[in-house]
Amino acid sequence: MKIRISSIILLAPLFCLCGCQPKVESERPVIQFVSDLIQDRSSAGHQLLDSFKQKDPGGNIVICGPQEEVSSLAFSLFLSDNFDNVDARPVRDSLLDFSGEVISRVVIKDEGPLNTFETEEGAERLRELTVKAALASLDTLSYRTLSDMSSYSHKAKGKVLVLSSSAMAAYGKYDLDSLLRVFNIQDVIFFPLELMAEKVAGDEDTRVGIVSSKPKKLYEEFFKYQPDFEGSLIGVYPKEIVLDSVSVVDTMALDVLLLDDYSVRADTLRARFPKIQVLDPGKVVNEACFKAMRRRNIFTHRVAYPKWEGFSAILNEDSEFILTDSDDR
């Protein structure tokens, strides 16, 4: 079934590598930055993706986005024990799922560009910044301080990346997916909003609500390009009216809640609405990372607690993300 948001369903993009000059062919054009990166073999971004090794266990799990989202997802990954580490059955085995792994938290300090999608210019910039955030997170380049650009720091490469921003999922995911396909990179980058949407069980009569303080336009943009989503998006509701004594969940007869407010605990919603399917970002991210790392066979297999390190992602004058060591490394 198809989600009933608009009557327009865009065709899925087609990608190809043509001879020695890779390019993207698509019903929906990618931004110029992506086209230029694909064509320019000498660019740092092209070389980074061209040399990416899918089966290399070296590197870290990287979470990039706003502070609250990154902290929540990193904590969830750190404590995750949802699978048997031997045969991947969905049972607890008292061994942390990501034992021996390093979780890198990359916090985008200026969230302003993530909220400027209301204008065409802002949406275009957000699309470009999504790709740039991914490249910076996968790369090994970082600095000790922003004031001393000659003082390099050590940053392990990213082997799995979670981009937490729903705005990036709505506006920049398409461009990033297009770029990764050209380099045959799969099972590497995940968006919590997309992972939750994929978990919705039902049909077009399934009434879906989103717990979020972000504009509904953001989610309409995201679902416009998700033709396989099973359900009908009824509305986007801030936590205050979801948790109110007379909740919108009851008055709107919702069947599913997607939790996109990291200040709300999923267990609180499940206790309040026991008959509702509640999908939360932490759980779907844990599952996606675990299964992808098993498929690619990139666990370190070190017997140790997970570790984490922190970086700040700061935009420079050229609108490039510069990663610097964070105080909470």
For each predicted feature, which ranges?
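Bacterial N-terminal signal peptides that target proteins for export
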Residues: M1-I8
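Residues embedded in well-ordered secondary-structure elements
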Residues: I8-I9, F52
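Bacterial N-terminal signal peptides
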Residues: I9-C16
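Non-catalytic structural scaffold of enzyme domains
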Residues: C20-R329
